[in-house]
């Protein structure tokens, strides 16, 4: 079934109003509405001063390990994304309980080595030095003065609090506790035989899993027994198993997760006491036990327990490489190089380490050294393909296209199935073939364009975006009018000469302000340009619709980025960022004199109907809803809530499928993990639209021909919105909430951490489908402000470029209208790849 867009009846409610009319208000800390409001507030504040960071998270300073570099910060935007903050809370009444606290911390690390959340130690006023030993056992320990254990109900800054006691030790995995989302979970108090009995209420010395949004914050419980019965969630006794039950030397049941020694005489002996004694270790023995554990380990814990290496020791080379990979993942490439440089000195027989060292040196822009170590890594047949792929990338970064092609070919000779080498071979072969083709236009008549130019199976959004940027300046978006400079290529003297030969240099759009995608030591963000080269750009320089793309909780070092940012703003004649959230964040990093140069320039994909006459007419729509999810940096996106997210999405899809066919829009192959997980875990199969295989026109046609897009990627919302299609954002990154705040539609977003995600998403989606003309009209109305801001900025930019207005004059182009329905037989079928069932 297909439909045409049509004009809604006067007085029709917008989808935002319709969708939210019956949605009950939730705790403000976790709702997307509050998140977007926070984005709006920061945007408004940034008009006259830099927006301030929210109050420091409880872990920010007090819990940082002494070895942490002061320049490293975790970007905390939980108020925007709704990401859950989890903490353990332990009340220590006196110094006599400190050994119990230490045993608890050791047991937690040894049984859950991949888990590291804040541990808030509540105490009545013990001296700071009392916690020195505990600090050595956990990198995120936060002592906090409290009047009693009940203060665990009052821990501001956290959504979920797991209250433990010094009388407990952890014997198993606690993932189930982390996944709890409602009420206060506890094991009922024990009866005379020690077995939990619901009639005995909740003991004050047992485990509690507290969801703080369910509590009355004005009057939280004064003790466990005061928890309202309606909030209680019973836990199986294995999560708080009483050692008193193990009389006559009974063994501890194998499934016990938390063993509680409350009221157990210290003179007792037996298997339970032996289980606890296993965690009475000195620091050296404990560190050795943790490092010897198999499987995944949390990066914070591994760094905390492994470093510094004991003086005179020779740490295992695999451990050194693991630590270097952690530093690399956090952008601390200098620390990784320092570790690996010592380890591989005089050791050409360590290919994996040489590969990692080469990649880290490349991230520091120490390209000659990087090439040497990567070549050493190619000596191993096992690592040669990966090393050759990195060498191809390195040579490409330096403009050595023939060398890059040769390295990629060598990698394919080592392993003909290596996808990375095959992609580099295809890219560089095309570049070599096109190298002799010169545009008809002289350089002085061209614009230089610095951006990410996706190829092959890369992100579909990064394919559409550069063309949209160019459409703002010229009707011809091809190589005759534009000189393409990939942002990741090093701008050397020859590159600088090419840029300066152009009429102007346009940088953007996209999330270029991101430290860990193609890191380099020259700028600290995605444009690989040294400060001294940037200072010698003489062509007019415009930063256009760029985004501050740092993830919630992402750690990075700001100094190099901030210095490059200041140089960029100083040099730019125009500096426009794609949302007010980015404007506020970037202004925070600038001196006062430069802040007002930062202005708002929406992403041009959001105004596609005004840029492309082909999109200005009526849209003919199928009865489909498209969903998109993203999986890069999944830990930062989902935290502990991925299973919850998947289950809630399954419920929403079942509900929405009653009104429309639900299909999946993959912007890149990795996005298809969602349909695989959905089928495996919940038995649902979705047809897949592989957007990464489509042309830009086909991508826009697909998004224009559906009735609703539910997207997690930024451009899975902005591209359909720009084509006039209603959207709902799955908020896992601040940029989605920032965009919704800009268009004053915060309720078009639902956090991936939302407890009632499935119900909220289904309700909002069905409201859009029920009154689709009103939803489309609301999208068109929201676009007007974005187009007005874009037109005003383009007027300024025409003064820089000297180019004519591609839209026919200084006045605003007329808004596209929503026409009356037309027969389905008249519609122009979009060209697209047929959906694939997964």
Where are the model-predicted features located?
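GT-A fold catalytic core of metal-dependent nucleotide-sugar glycosyltransferases
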Residues: 145-192
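Register position in tetratricopeptide repeats
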Residues: 329, 363-364, 397-398, 427-431
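Structural marker of alpha-solenoid helical repeat scaffolds
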Residues: 312, 346, 380-381, 414
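A glycosyltransferase accessory/donor-loop signature
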Residues: 76-90, 97-103, 115, 121-123, ...
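Active-site anion-handling motifs in enzyme catalytic cores
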Residues: 426-838
């Amino acid at each position: 079934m297909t439909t045409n867009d049509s004009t809604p009846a006067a007085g029709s409610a917008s989808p935002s109003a319709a969708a939210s009319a019956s949605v009950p208000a939730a705790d403000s800390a976790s709702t997307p509405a509050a998140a977007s409001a926070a984005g709006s507030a920061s945007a408004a504040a940034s008009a006259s001063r830099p927006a301030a960071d929210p109050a420091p998270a409880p872990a920010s300073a007090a819990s940082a390990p002494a070895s942490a570099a002061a320049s490293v910060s975790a970007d905390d935007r939980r108020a925007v994304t709704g990401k859950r903050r989890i903490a353990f809370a332990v009340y220590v009444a006196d110094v006599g309980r400190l050994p119990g606290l230490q045993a608890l911390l050791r047991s937690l690390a040894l049984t859950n080595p991949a888990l590291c959340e804040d541990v808030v130690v509540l105490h009545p006023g013990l001296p700071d030095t009392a916690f020195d030993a505990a600090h050595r056992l956990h990198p995120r320990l936060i002592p906090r003065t409290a009047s009693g254990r009940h203060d665990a109900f009052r821990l501001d800054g956290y959504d979920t609090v797991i209250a433990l006691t010094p009388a407990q030790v952890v014997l198993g995995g606690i993932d189930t506790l982390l996944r709890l989302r409602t009420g206060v979970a506890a094991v009922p108090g024990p009866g005379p035989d020690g077995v939990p009995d619901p009639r005995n209420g909740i003991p004050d010395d047992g485990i509690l899993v507290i969801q703080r949004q369910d509590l009355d914050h004005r009057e939280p419980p004064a003790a466990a027994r005061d928890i309202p019965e309606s909030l209680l969630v019973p836990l199986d006794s294995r999560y708080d198993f009483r050692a008193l039950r193990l009389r006559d030397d009974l063994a501890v049941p194998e499934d016990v997760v938390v063993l509680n020694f409350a009221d157990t005489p210290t003179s007792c002996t037996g298997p339970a006491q032996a289980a606890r004694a296993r965690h009475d270790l000195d620091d050296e023995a404990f560190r050795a036990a943790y490092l010897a554990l198999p499987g995944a380990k949390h990066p914070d814990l591994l760094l905390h327990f492994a470093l510094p290496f004991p003086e005179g020791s020779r740490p295992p080379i695999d451990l050194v490489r693991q630590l270097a990979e952690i530093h690399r993942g956090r952008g601390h490439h200098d620390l990784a190089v320092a570790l690996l440089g010592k380890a591989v000195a005089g050791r050409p027989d360590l290919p994996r380490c040489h590969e990692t060292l080469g990649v880290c040196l490349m991230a520091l822009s120490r390209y000659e050294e990087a090439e040497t170590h990567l070549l050493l890594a190619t000596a191993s047949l096992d690592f040669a393909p990966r090393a050759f792929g990195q060498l191809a990338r390195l040579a490409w970064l330096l403009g050595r296209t023939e060398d890059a092609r040769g390295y990629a070919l060598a990698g394919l000779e080592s392993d003909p199935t290596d996808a990375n080498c095959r992609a580099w071979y295809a890219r560089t072969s095309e570049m070599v073939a096109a190298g002799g083709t010169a545009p008809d236009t002289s350089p002085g008549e061209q614009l230089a364009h610095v951006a990410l130019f996706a190829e092959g199976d890369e992100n579909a959004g990064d394919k559409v975006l550069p063309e949209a940027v160019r459409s703002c300046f010229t009707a011809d978006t091809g190589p005759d009018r534009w000189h393409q400079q990939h942002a990741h290529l090093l701008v050397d003297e020859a590159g600088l000469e090419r840029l300066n030969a152009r009429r102007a240099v346009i940088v953007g759009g996209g999330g270029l302000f991101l430290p860990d995608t193609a890191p380099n030591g020259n700028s600290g963000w995605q444009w690989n340009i040294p400060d001294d080269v940037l200072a010698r750009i003489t062509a007019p320089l415009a930063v256009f619709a760029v985004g501050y793309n740092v993830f919630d909780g992402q750690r990075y070092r700001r100094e190099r980025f901030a210095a490059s940012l200041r140089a960029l703003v100083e040099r730019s004649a125009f500096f426009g960022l794609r949302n007010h959230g980015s404007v506020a964040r970037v202004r925070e990093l600038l001196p006062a004199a430069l802040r007002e140069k930062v202005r708002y320039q929406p992403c041009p994909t959001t105004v596609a109907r005004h840029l492309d006459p082909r999109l200005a007419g009526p849209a003919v729509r199928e009865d489909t809803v498209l969903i998109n999810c993203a999986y890069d940096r999944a830990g930062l996106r989902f935290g502990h809530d991925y299973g919850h997210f998947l289950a809630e999405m399954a419920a929403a899809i079942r509900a929405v499928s009653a009104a429309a066919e639900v299909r999946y829009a993959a912007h890149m192959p990795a996005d298809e993990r969602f349909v695989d997980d959905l089928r495996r875990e919940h038995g649902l199969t979705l047809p897949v639209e592989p957007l990464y295989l489509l042309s830009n026109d086909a991508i826009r046609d697909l998004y224009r021909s559906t009735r609703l897009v539910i997207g997690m990627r930024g451009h899975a919302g902005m591209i359909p919105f720009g084509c006039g299609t209603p959207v709902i954002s799955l908020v896992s990154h601040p940029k989605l909430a920032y965009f919704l705040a800009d268009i004053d539609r915060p309720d078009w977003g639902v956090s991936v951490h939302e407890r009632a995600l499935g119900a909220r998403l289904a309700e909002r989606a069905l409201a859009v489908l029920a009154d689709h003309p009103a939803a489309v009209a609301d999208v068109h109305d929201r676009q007007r402000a974005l187009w007005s801001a874009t037109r005003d900025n383009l007027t300024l930019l025409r003064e820089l470029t000297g180019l004519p207005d591609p839209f026919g004059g200084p006045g605003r182009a007329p808004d596209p209208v929503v026409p009356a329905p037309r027969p389905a037989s008249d519609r122009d079928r979009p060209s697209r790849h047929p959906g694939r069932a997964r």
